[in-house]
């Protein structure tokens, strides 16, 4: 499970060091793709494969399903962390997420999200008031 918030730096070559506690779970390879709210999503290869298969099984006659599959496939980069636990983020991914040197990596249970630090702070501030309401929507009667 991917949990927590980390603040790695993006180096001049576009490399980001993944949190040490997640490296074993990502050792079999990982997929970096465009995420929600201009973040990047990082999936273990197996998790991404299941997601991609589910997306591909959607009706090909549905324009929204086709658009999602195209965006997912075209916007994904397969990576393997180096010996120092770094991955290289493509220029397109860095541009999409507006990444500067200061980044935030957050655990999102079954995947990671990579955010520009300022964008993450803005998102958190804008959504603090909605957290209680979102909890009820996401978990319903569980909480």
From Swiss-Prot:
InterPro entries, sorted: MraZ (IPR003444), MraZ_C (IPR035644), MraZ_dom (IPR020603), MraZ_N (IPR035642), MraZ_sf (IPR038619), SpoVT-AbrB_dom (IPR007159), SpoVT-AbrB_sf (IPR037914)
Chief location of this protein within or outside the cell: cytoplasm
Subcellular location, record wording: Cytoplasm, Nucleoid
GO CC, alphabetical: cytoplasm; nucleoid
Disulphide-bonded residues: none
Keywords recorded for this protein, A-Z: Cytoplasm, DNA-binding, Repeat, Transcription, Transcription regulation
Domain SpoVT-AbrB per the UniProt entry, residue ranges: 5-47, 76-119
UniProt keyword Cytoplasm, yes or no: yes
Entry's Gene Ontology BP terms: negative regulation of DNA-templated transcription initiation
Family: Belongs to the MraZ family.
Protein name: Transcriptional regulator MraZ
Organism: Rhodococcus opacus (strain B4)
This protein's encoding gene: mraZ
